[in-house]
């Protein structure tokens, strides 16, 4: 590994102008004309569990993927791929929808994570190609081939919930079906709460 590392540094140094140009071209293309069938991905304002959206936004933030509110609402998008029904249908953009555009620095990653249909069938890469994030998080979402004018960045405030037991309480009801439900269950099991 040592010699391979040195050879890589030397090759990069010897081709530094070309390397810099390739990086610049990569980001210019990502922000102006990215590859891929879909131009935007929409996480709908309605029909989604808030905790699931929050978990998605945490993942997007951790990976540097930008997401925005729409510039205007009421636009009807035809031929939008609906993840949950696996069909193309019309969708009207709503005020609190979240748009993940393909045109951004992390274009390739965003498109990979939101691509509705897997193209690789190799079992060696199944774990990284099998699931698009709307499927992973169980979100109502659309993949759009059209350009959508984006508005302000959507930095969603993530709320931490706290639960405190009062004396005499002996139970609590937890909504099941979210990642947070699993985290809660894991924590109480660690604390040996029965």
Where are these regions (language model features)?
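Intrinsic-disorder/low-complexity accessory segments
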Residues: 1-194
